[in-house]
Amino acid sequence: MKRSHKDYLEDIAEAIELIEEFTREICFEDFLCDKKTQFAVIRALEIIGEASKNIPNDFKRLHPEIPWREMARMRDKLIHAYFGVDVRVLWKTVKEDIPSLKGKFEKLRK
């Protein structure tokens, strides 16, 4: 069955929630030592990026407040440079970009 853009939007929203859940009660030092959480966050970011690539361009143009291109680029960096992921950049994404993205998605889904 073909998936709709709403399915992909749900995938993104769910991945955002999971990232927040995985990192809710840890500090950077704990994150730095926790390979399982790093791996889970990376996977969720890959899902966000992959789902964003499947959103129709017409829909993306209607919602320029969402960083579609950046989401896809992050996925590409994680997939193709998995051995060189900078954990500091990953943490900054989790703590700064994900909350902002969540707010934008909440508005979009209303």
Curated annotation (Swiss-Prot):
Hydrolase keyword on record: yes
Keywords: Hydrolase, Nuclease, Nucleotide-binding, Phosphoprotein, Toxin-antitoxin system
EC number, UniProt record: 3.1.-.-
Residues bearing PTM O-di-AMP-tyrosine: 82
Catalytic residues in the record: 75, 80
Single GO MF descriptor: nucleotide binding
TM region positions: none
First-level EC class: hydrolase
Pfam families in alphabetical order: HepT-like
Motif (RX(4)HXY motif): 75-82
Highest taxon listed in the record's lineage: Archaea
Post-translational modification: Modified by cognate antitoxin MntA; probably at least 2 successive AMPylation events occur on Tyr-82.
GO cellular component: toxin-antitoxin complex
The protein's role, per its UniProt record: Toxic component of a type VII toxin-antitoxin (TA) system. Overexpression in E.coli inhibits cell growth. Neutralized by cognate antitoxin MntA. Neutralization is probably due to AMPylation by MntA. Probably an RNAase.
Protein family membership: Belongs to the HepT RNase toxin family.
Protein known as: Probable ribonuclease HepT
